From Swiss-Prot:
Protein name, as recorded: Complement C1r-A subcomponent
Residues annotated as binding Ca(2+) 1: E65, D73, D118
Cleaved signal peptide residues: 1-16
General function of this protein: Serine protease component of the complement C1 complex, a multiprotein complex that initiates the classical pathway of the complement system, a cascade of proteins that leads to phagocytosis and breakdown of pathogens and signaling that strengthens the adaptive immune system. C1R catalyzes the first enzymatic step in the classical complement pathway: it is activated by the C1Q subcomplex of the C1 complex, which associates with IgG or IgM immunoglobulins complexed with antigens to form antigen-antibody complexes on the surface of pathogens.
Species, as recorded: Mus musculus (Mouse)
Enzyme type, top EC level: hydrolase
Sequence positions that bind Ca(2+) 2: D141, L142, E144, N166, Y167, G170
Boundaries of every Sushi domain copy: 306-372, 373-448
Pfam families from the UniProt entry: CUB, FXa_inhibition, Sushi, Trypsin
Phosphoserine carried by residues: S205
Subcellular locations according to the entry: Secreted; Cell surface
The organism's taxonomic lineage, starting at the top: Eukaryota, Metazoa, Chordata, Craniata, Vertebrata
Domain notes: The CUB domain 2 shows a compact folded structure in the presence of Ca(2+), whereas it has a flexible, disordered conformation in the absence of Ca(2+). Ca(2+) could provide a switch between the folded and disordered forms; low Ca(2+) could provide flexibility to promote autoprocessing and activation of CIR.
Length: 707
């Protein structure tokens, strides 16, 4: 027994108080738990949690010698200078006074557990062993602001003079409006010199209302709401401010200001009328003297959004979208125009218009006007013109014009299937753009009319020798000078069809030729002297067919070339293009054609354009004739011949490059079926021509298929 007592002493130290470390939770046990506790012992365990918390204790195991009144062994729980209970026995046992599952709670942050045992644990002469107890504790938030009638521990009852606010682990104090918390953090003192209200509505009152207000006040209540709102004041009953029957408000008074203007000074028992301040900034100044017992005043303030004037259109074409019965601050309206009209702000065109009601009751933009859309002067049409269908010179919305080409020399290009009635008609649209119903914004094009001479050749009898051409007989005729005289024919309005050998002659050494020989092209007259006076047309590009071989003197295969002029020419009665062939019928034996040129006639240079009428000859006859002349020049499928050996008529030197022109009677157009290429002598037999039909695809490809 002595040794057991010694071990207890070594384990617990001396009897007395045991202070547990301050924590938010933990456990408490009897000495040596779960082994039997020693005899003749008394210890007090002190449980402490942080300030602002209470201690909650629950027993999980309890096995202490039972006795009536827990006289021998017991556990005593104390807190806040009060005993919460004295316990012994076993849990769930009727003997003694076990704590069961009861929760023990302190009011402060401290709790004491005193464990007492007597000198022995005997029952009917038998020594009994008891395990003791196991308990858990935890910190629980203390609501310092709640009523604590049983708390006697100093410092637990909060001393907030006005308002108390609890939080986990503590509390803080605050004051009623118009009072200021003092340095002690608990007491409040009247302070209303700068009270600010910013909500759109609320209540304002004197201090302690409806109880008498304090003396010696100098209060300033400021209402500041968002710009664009106006403040309305409505005073409530009761309204009591000390006054005097003979002198107006000599003691206490309430002054109201809005926008720096004094709206009145009020006192007595008659509440002021409702006030519309027309301002978003209102100040209420309340002054009191050192005495009085009036109950003061209270008001309810509300706000209303400021209004802007109703928008009004400046003209009949202006549309105000979704008009409202009234417009307030931040409301807006949108303006559009009737179709065909443009929004205008001063001289500036607008894509859209929105005006916003400002906080001063004005619109942030002035109302615009609607001006009729103007498409402007119609574009000029190359080789054409236009006329006004509607009022002349008017180019505004719904105005109409019609383009036309300079006929009969040009015709208008339109898409397939387009309506004849809408051809060239353009209307000024609501977008301010000239537009055709079928072509859209795309401008029409005037294309040259080919093969329609104004004064065509009408001679039907055979011509024995060439004769002078009259103006307009062969308006496609070109006069060229490169290595001497040559001819050509106008295609479209900026291309010349000619023979390649007029540019790169067979008898010239190619190495001595310039890469770009000087080409002079003349058009528009039948007289050499006059045609030169009209001036030459600069050549932008020379295109030789790839089959042409300059270095093979007797081979005229591919003897065809195109000259692209720098500028398009203006067509007229003496300057018109010729058409290209589209079928083999133009090459039937005996079909008559015309060859024109400024070449040699009767061994002399011609100064006037001359022409000759020739039949298409039989190819086999031409081949046999060449054999009789012992000429080895190739006569291929890309060539044809014309003339009659029995009749001395033919193209001659200087006519090269000119065309063999045939009239298509079905379409009443003239077609260039051949190009004067080569022959033997002048007027001594057949002449040989480049067959244009075989080169039409190449021609169109090089010209871009634009004519």
């Amino acid at each position: 027994m002595w040794l057991f007592a010694l071990l207890v002493t070594l384990f617990y130290g001396v009897e007395g108080s045991i202070y547990l470390p301050q924590k938010l939770y933990g456990e408490v046990t009897s000495p040596l738990y779960p082994k039997p506790y020693p005899s003749d012992l008394e210890t007090t365990t002190v449980i402490t949690v942080p300030m602002g918390y209470r201690v909650k204790l629950v027993f999980w195991q309890f096995d202490v010698e039972p006795s009536e009144g827990c006289f021998y062994d017991y556990v005593k729980i104390s807190a806040d200078k009060q005993t919460l209970g004295r316990f012994c026995g076993q849990l769930d046992s009727p003997l003694g006074n076990p704590p069961g599952s009861k929760e023990f709670m302190s009011q402060g942050n401290k709790m004491l557990l005193t464990f007492h045992t007597d000198f022995s644990n005997e029952e009917n002469g038998t020594i009994m062993f008891y395990k003791g107890f196991l308990a858990y504790y935890q910190a629980v938030d203390l609501d310092e602001c709640a009523s604590q009638p049983n708390s006697v521990e100093e410092g637990l009852q909060p001393r907030c003079q006005h308002l108390c606010h609890n939080y986990v682990g503590g509390y803080f104090c605050s004051c009623h409006p118009g009072y200021e918390l003092q340095k002690d953090g608990q007491s409040c003192q009247a302070e209303c010199s700068s009270e600010l209200y910013t909500e759109p509505s609320g209540y304002v009152s004197s201090l302690e209302y409806p109880q008498p207000y304090p003396p010696d006040l100098r209060c300033n209540y400021s209402i500041r709401v968002e710009r664009g709102l106006t403040v309305h004041l409505k005073f409530l009953d009761p309204f009591e401010i000390d006054d005097h029957q003979q002198v107006h408000c000599p003691y206490d008074q309430l002054q109201i200001y809005a926008n720096g203007k004094n709206l009145g000074e009020f006192c007595g028992k008659q509440r002021p009328p409702d006030l519309d301040t027309s301002s978003n900034a209102v100040d209420l100044l309340f002054f009191t003297d050192e005495s009085g017992d009036s109950r003061g005043w209270k008001l309810h303030y509300t706000t209303e959004t400021i209004k802007c004037p109703q928008p009004k259109a400046l003209d009949e074409f202006t549309i105000i979208q979704d008009p409202q019965p009234q417009y307030q601050f931040r409301d807006y309206f949108i303006v559009t125009c009737k179709q065909g009209y443009q929004l205008m702000e001063g001289n500036q065109a607008l894509l859209s218009f929105t005006a916003v009601c400002q906080n001063d009751g004005t619109w942030h933009r002035a109302m615009p006007r609607c001006k009729i859309k103007n498409c402007g002067q119609p574009q000029s049409l190359s080789n054409g013109d236009f006329r006004y269908i509607t009022t002349k010179g008017v180019t505004t919305y719904e105005a109409s014009i019609q383009y036309h080409c300079h006929e009969p020399y040009y015709k208008m290009l339109t898409r397939a299937g387009s309506s004849e009635s809408m051809r060239g008609i353009y209307t000024c649209t609501a977008q301010g753009i000239w537009k055709n119903e079928e072509e859209g914004e795309k401008m029409p094009r005037c294309l040259p009319v080919c093969g329609k001479p104004v004064n065509p050749v009408t001679q039907k009898e055979r011509i024995i020798r060439g004769q002078p051409a009259r103006p307009g007989n062969f308006p496609w005729q070109a006069f060229t000078t490169t290595h001497g005289r040559g001819g050509g024919a106008l295609l479209g309005d900026r291309w010349i069809l000619t023979a390649a050998h007029t540019i790169y002659p067979k008898h010239h050494n190619k190495e001595n030729d310039n890469a770009n020989p000087k080409m002079l092209v003349f058009l528009g007259h039948t007289n050499v002297e006059q045609i030169k006076k009209l001036g030459h047309h600069p050549v932008r590009r020379v295109i030789i067919h790839p089959d042409y071989r300059q270095d093979e003197p007797n081979n005229f295969e591919g003897d065809i070339a195109l000259l692209e002029l720098e500028n398009s020419v203006t067509l007229g009665p003496e300057l018109l293009p010729i058409c290209l062939p589209d079928n083999e019928t133009f090459y039937g034996q005996g079909l008559m054609g015309y060859v024109s040129g400024f070449g040699i006639t009767e061994d002399k240079l011609a100064f006037d354009l001359r022409f000759v009428r020739l039949p298409v000859a039989d190819s086999e006859a031409c081949q046999r004739w060449l054999q009789t002349k012992k000429d080895t020049s190739p006569f291929s499928q890309n060539m044809f011949c014309s003339g009659d050996p029995a009749v001395q008529q033919d193209a001659c030197q200087g006519d090269s490059g000119g065309v063999f022109a045939v009239r298509d009677r079905n379409r009443d157009i003239w077609v260039a079926t051949g190009i004067v290429s080569w022959g033997i002598g002048c007027g001594e037999g057949y002449g040989f021509y480049t067959k244009v039909l075989n080169y039409v695809d190449w021609i169109k490809k090089e010209m871009g298929d634009e004519n």
